[in-house]
């Protein structure tokens, strides 16, 4: 952003050539005042954009220092959030892959269970316990204990 952005400045070329030296000086002073006011307003806007400085009095050097710190903080935070997003995308892809594998296993298990057995409503799970065909293979009883929401855990993936 240059000093001339958002400022309407009249050039000296538009003025009649017969201006006195005093008129030229007054015009130049007015342009300089506009430029300084624009810079002042820009610093106030920057100060109000930095959370630690909002509404406080601060020198221009302090405003620039705090703005620099805030930008660096936001960059680090953005980088961390981007890493979290990437981790969640990888975790989501893994979970989708597991869902597809489980659906495939379930469909192949259903093909095997189509053959008559003595009691097809009871099966054994991987731990050797008896489960009902209707509970989906869960080891916990959802009737006796309310299910507590599980905290989301980060999935650590090793590079392959």
Curated annotation (Swiss-Prot):
Xref: Pfam families: HLH
Feature: compositional bias, Polar residues: 107-124
InterPro entries: bHLH_dom, HLH_DNA-bd_sf
PTM sites of type Phosphoserine: 2, 11, 107
Keyword Transcription assigned: yes
Location of region: Leucine-zipper: 81-102
Listed Basic and acidic residues bias regions: 29-40
N-acetylserine found at: 2
Source species, domain of life: Eukaryota
TM annotation in the entry: none
Compositional bias segments (type: Acidic residues): 1-13
GO biological process: cellular response to peptide hormone stimulus; cellular response to starvation; negative regulation of gene expression; negative regulation of transcription by RNA polymerase II; neuron apoptotic process; positive regulation of DNA-templated transcription; positive regulation of transcription by RNA polymerase II; protein-containing complex assembly
Modified residues (N6-acetyllysine): 66, 153-154
Domain bHLH, first and last residues per copy: 23-74
Region (Disordered): 1-40, 105-160
Maturation and modification: Phosphorylated.
Keywords on record: Acetylation, Activator, Cell projection, DNA-binding, Nucleus, Phosphoprotein, Repressor, Transcription, Transcription regulation
Protein localization: Nucleus; Cell projection, Dendrite
GO molecular function: DNA binding; DNA-binding transcription factor activity; DNA-binding transcription factor activity, RNA polymerase II-specific; DNA-binding transcription factor binding; DNA-binding transcription repressor activity, RNA polymerase II-specific; E-box binding; identical protein binding; protein dimerization activity
Gene Ontology cellular component terms for the protein in this record: chromatin; dendrite; Mad-Max complex; MLL1 complex; Myc-Max complex; nucleus; PML body; protein-DNA complex
Family the entry assigns: Belongs to the MAX family.
Job of this protein: Transcription regulator. Forms a sequence-specific DNA-binding protein complex with MYC or MAD which recognizes the core sequence 5'-CAC[GA]TG-3'. The MYC:MAX complex is a transcriptional activator, whereas the MAD:MAX complex is a repressor. May repress transcription via the recruitment of a chromatin remodeling complex containing H3 'Lys-9' histone methyltransferase activity. Represses MYC transcriptional activity from E-box elements.
Subunit structure: Efficient DNA binding requires dimerization with another bHLH protein. Binds DNA as a heterodimer with MYC or MAD. Part of the E2F6.com-1 complex in G0 phase composed of E2F6, MGA, MAX, TFDP1, CBX3, BAT8, EUHMTASE1, RING1, RNF2, MBLR, L3MBTL2 and YAF2. Component of some MLL1/MLL complex, at least composed of the core components KMT2A/MLL1, ASH2L, HCFC1/HCF1, WDR5 and RBBP5, as well as the facultative components BACC1, CHD8, E2F6, HSP70, INO80C, KANSL1, LAS1L, MAX, MCRS1, MGA, MYST1/MOF, PELP1, PHF20, PRP31, RING2, RUVB1/TIP49A, RUVB2/TIP49B, SENP3, TAF1, TAF4, TAF6, TAF7, TAF9 and TEX10.
Protein name (database record): Protein max
Species of the source: Rattus norvegicus (Rat)
